[in-house]
């Protein structure tokens, strides 16, 4: 899902979140067709970044949306001094970040698709290979 603003003072207001969810759904329907429906929501910065989300979580659920967070990352938004500079480094960054988490039976990788993230696109086939070699399966979120 997309978002247009971060929540002021890291306090999320459910009305703003629901409006954002509706705007996002409408934008996606314009591109993908009126039949499009997502069942997933990712808070900007992740669920762990905000306070007072219980009401918003409930309202999102009423809209048929479940929130999800990432539990590992490829490092493409990290400070330049620690950001991977090649494909192998990108895969290693994911492996290291995944090893920090206690729950690794499901991996949700944070990656960005901005114009400046060429390495992310270049590394994607190797990232997929890495997860397949580790026995992960790929599926569709709806």
Task: Label every PLM stretch briefly.
Residues 100, 110-115, 119:
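Catalytic cysteine-centered active loop of the rhodanese-like fold, especially the PTP/DSP P-loop
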Residues 1-85, 102-111:
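Metal-dependent polysaccharide deacetylase catalytic core of the NodB/CE4 family, i.e.
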Residues 27-31, 93-97, 130:
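A generic secondary-structure signal
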Residues 64-68, 92-95, 133-137:
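Glycine-rich loops and low-complexity Gly/Arg-rich segments
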Residues 83-87, 117-120:
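Short amphipathic alpha-helix initiation/capping segments at coil-to-helix junctions
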Residues 87-102:
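A short, acidic, amphipathic alpha-helical segment used as a generic capping/interface helix at domain edges
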Residues 116-142:
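C-terminal domain-boundary segment and adjacent tail
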Residues 17, 21, 90, 120, ...:
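Aromatic/hydrophobic pocket-lining residues that form the small-molecule binding cavity
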């Amino acid at each position: 899902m997309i978002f247009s603003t971060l929540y002021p003072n890291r306090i999320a207001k459910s009305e703003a979140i629901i409006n954002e969810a509706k705007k996002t759904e409408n934008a996606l329907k314009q591109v993908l067709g009126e039949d499009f429906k997502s069942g997933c929501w990712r808070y900007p910065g992740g669920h762990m970044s905000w306070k007072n989300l219980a009401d918003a979580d409930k309202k999102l659920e009423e809209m048929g949306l479940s929130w999800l967070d990432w539990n590992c990352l490829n490092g493409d938004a990290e400070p330049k001094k620690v950001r991977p500079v090649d494909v192998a480094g990108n895969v290693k960054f994911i492996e290291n970040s995944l090893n920090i988490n206690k729950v690794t039976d499901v991996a949700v990788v944070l990656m960005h698709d901005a114009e400046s993230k060429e390495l992310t696109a270049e590394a994607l086939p190797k990232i997929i290979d890495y997860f397949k070699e580790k026995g992960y399966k790929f599926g569709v979120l709806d």
